[in-house]
Amino acid sequence: MSSPGDTAVLVLAAGPGTRMRSDTPKVLHPLGGRSMLSHLLHAIAKVAPQHLAVVLGHDHERIAPLIADWADDLGRPIDVALQERPRGTGDAVRCGLSALPDDYAGVLVVTSGDTPLLDADTVADLIAGHTATRAAVTVLTTTLSDPSGYGRILRTQDNEVTAIVEHADATESQREIREVNAGVYAFDTAALRSALNRLSADNAQQELYLTDVIAILRGDGLPIRARHVDDSALVAGVNNRVQLAQLGAELNRRIVAAHQLAGVTVVDPATTWIDVDVTIGRDTVIHPGTQLLGRTQIGGHCVVGPDTTLTDVSVGDGASVVRTHGTGSSVGAGATVGPFAYLRPGTVLGDDGKLGAFVETKNATIGTGTKVPHLTYVGDADIGEHSNIGASSVFVNYDGESKRRTTVGSHVRTGSDTMFVAPVTVGDGAYTGAGTVVREDVPPGALAVSAGPQRNIEGWVRRKRPGSAAARAAEAAEKAAGGRPAGEAE
């Protein structure tokens, strides 16, 4: 039998996933910020098996490079085996054994790649229970209110597992059974190898079922064990997008609850979505309609939302981000962002800074205490500390061929509707007048004004727009003031 301490895990991910109706391989469909397969591999890596391999078939050329990336992230090898033709789960396991050493004789855990909520504790418990009983196989089971599509667990009157019958091959009475195969097993590898050689495709699907191994091993007189998982979501599989959405919602519910128990206020969990790799500090408040995605990091005592989506954004302690869409950006401690701000990749807002209503930023560094209050585009720019950018200003960064940068110093005050035509530098302490087009560098402490003196052409409306509402209003105003219509001869 198996030697304690020797563990290998085989993940079956060769199926085409036709019920997903998708060009994307089933195991690559995301939920909670990772693909289904990535979730599973991260969980298994925590168990630290000696060997970990994934069996691929359909779209293996798309999945294998991602597995290599995940292996690097996890700091451990993950082998790949190929099932050339889809001949069932039994054949997939036989192909997977080729990724293990020929003399491997320890515990072999087999699981499907579409069980994204399977966690390390459940796998570790399976291995421990299997090793303690020295069984030939231990299968995880769960009980479902609607077991349609799942293999049923057959037991004797003494409650011993005798076989697993697939739904397509089950009789009407067997389909009434609610205890189902969770698709996760721990095998004695030597016993498994022997049973695989005796599998038959004499079934409704004309495939080699891994589940048939149970009856074969029982026929050999070997001990069969089952471990029931009360939390069925942990072993639930995904075959279509309805199930994907259901498991995604369940995963999100667990993620949100974990943050709440850690000291985060989530006002409306039903409309708040948080990816698994997101971190949030204590006493932060998350308002309804907020999505925190990717590797977003939120500090403590922050206010985020409502109606905010942040992807790979870092937010410092005490910051406020309201009705904002941000990606690949950093918001400093005590800063305020929004409402209706758009932070594009490369945005860095310093501590106590402000990006107000209808401000868009991209590839821009905005210093400590600097304010961009409203209606402004800041792209490819570096702004110093404690400056103020007037409303409706634009950093004109594109000349039709390439992007160019603008540098604005510290303690700068710019008037509304200033255009910075890059490349240009505005020195520390400089000012610009309203409506200025900055085409040349502005020295420190200077006032830049590009507009000429205002010229009023009196009587223009009466002459050019006679009879218009504007002309009538102007005439009435002039008469009320006791004056003669502008431009009329005495």
UniProtKB/Swiss-Prot annotation:
Catalyzed reactions per annotation: alpha-D-glucosamine 1-phosphate + acetyl-CoA = N-acetyl-alpha-D-glucosamine 1-phosphate + CoA + H(+); N-acetyl-alpha-D-glucosamine 1-phosphate + UTP + H(+) = UDP-N-acetyl-alpha-D-glucosamine + diphosphate
Pfam families per the UniProt record, alphabetical: Hexapep, NTP_transf_3
Cofactor: record remark: Binds 1 Mg(2+) ion per subunit.
Keyword ATP-binding: no
Annotated GO MF terms: glucosamine-1-phosphate N-acetyltransferase activity; magnesium ion binding; UDP-N-acetylglucosamine diphosphorylase activity
Primary location class: cytoplasm
Annotated binding of UDP-N-acetyl-alpha-D-glucosamine, by residue: 12-15, 26, 83, 88-89, 112-114, 151, 166, 181, 239, 344, 362, 377, 388
Top EC group: transferase
This protein's pathway: Nucleotide-sugar biosynthesis; UDP-N-acetyl-alpha-D-glucosamine biosynthesis; N-acetyl-alpha-D-glucosamine 1-phosphate from alpha-D-glucosamine 6-phosphate (route II): step 2/2; Nucleotide-sugar biosynthesis; UDP-N-acetyl-alpha-D-glucosamine biosynthesis; UDP-N-acetyl-alpha-D-glucosamine from N-acetyl-alpha-D-glucosamine 1-phosphate: step 1/1; Bacterial outer membrane biogenesis; LPS lipid A biosynthesis
Binding-site residues for acetyl-CoA, renumbered to this chain: 391, 397-398, 416, 434
Protein name: Bifunctional protein GlmU
Organism: Mycolicibacterium paratuberculosis (strain ATCC BAA-968 / K-10)
Organism taxonomic ancestry: Bacteria, Bacillati, Actinomycetota, Actinomycetes, Mycobacteriales
